[in-house]
Amino acid sequence: MAFTFKQFHIDDFGCGMPVSTDAVILGAWAPLSDAQNILDIGAGSGLLSLMATQRSNAKVTSIELDDTAVNACQKNFEASPWTSRLTVKHSSVQEFSKQHQESEESLFDHIICNPPYFKGGTQSQNRLRAQARHTDTLDFCALLEAIGSLLAPNGTASLILPSQSMSEFGLVLADSSLEFSQVTDISDSQRKTPHRHLFTLCHKSTDASAKPNEGATEHFCIKELDGSYTEEMKLLITGFYLKY
């Protein structure tokens, strides 16, 4: 399916994970103002990479495991105004991380990822969709290990996960080199409990005074009770959706 945003166009035909509200919210929310070198893990059609390029002056490297998605991503990049700042690589994040360390290339000051989160259970009959949504090819431990090795010392990573995955993610995170620096709970409406969580990660600090405020959790509501977007949602997506 094709989607036209204010400054770019996305065709996600053949991609396991189509354009979603979750991805748009993550791409618009991630703190990118000072980023110069961004990594998009599991780029899919390239939506997050294109949003990051629109919102910053950074160079963006996108890694994607599936060859069909890589082709779609490359075409979307070539059709955008920022071709010179966008690069897509056909690779798993594990292999990319290994090669990146061996080549001693610069680390990334921001990493963005809409990760797979289903563990076990019945998978979609669509192989690409199953790969994009299930942790079989990229579990939380492997993801956090890769982010930890690719993220610059003062860098930040931005992710989004459903509520049912946060407990397991938190347990894995506790044993990693990273920690939460910001968490925003997302609700569909004021009457519904949070169903998604945006968060940023940073390297753990040994300086207690420099530790992030782990108790600070913000809240974000997508829709009013009548089904229309809230003002905060409109403000978030105003640079992307044609209607706003």
Curated annotation (Swiss-Prot):
Keywords: Cytoplasm, Methyltransferase, S-adenosyl-L-methionine, Transferase, tRNA processing
Domain of life from the UniProt record: Bacteria
GO biological process: tRNA processing
One MF annotation (Gene Ontology) recorded for this entry: tRNA (adenine-N6)-methyltransferase activity
SUPFAM superfamilies (UniProt xref): S-adenosyl-L-methionine-dependent methyltransferases (SSF53335)
Keyword Protein transport: no
CDD domains per record: AdoMet_MTases
Coiled coil: none
Record carries keyword Transmembrane: no
Enzyme Commission numbers on file: 2.1.1.223
Pfam families tied to this protein: MTS
Reaction equation(s) it catalyzes: adenosine(37) in tRNA1(Val) + S-adenosyl-L-methionine = N(6)-methyladenosine(37) in tRNA1(Val) + S-adenosyl-L-homocysteine + H(+)
A GO-annotated cellular component: cytoplasm
Subcellular localization, as worded in the UniProt entry: Cytoplasm
Catalytic class of the enzyme: transferase
InterPro entries per record: DNA_methylase_N6_adenine_CS (IPR002052), rRNA_Ade_Mease_Trfase_CS (IPR020596), SAM-dependent_MTases_sf (IPR029063), Small_mtfrase_dom (IPR007848), tRNA_Adenine-N(6)_MTase (IPR050210), tRNA_adenine-N6_MeTrfase (IPR022882)
Family: Belongs to the methyltransferase superfamily. tRNA (adenine-N(6)-)-methyltransferase family.
PANTHER family with a match to the protein in the record: TRNA1(VAL) (ADENINE(37)-N6)-METHYLTRANSFERASE
Function: Specifically methylates the adenine in position 37 of tRNA(1)(Val) (anticodon cmo5UAC).
Name of the protein in its database record: tRNA1(Val) (adenine(37)-N6)-methyltransferase
Native species: Shewanella sediminis (strain HAW-EB3)
Lineage start: Bacteria, Pseudomonadati, Pseudomonadota, Gammaproteobacteria, Alteromonadales
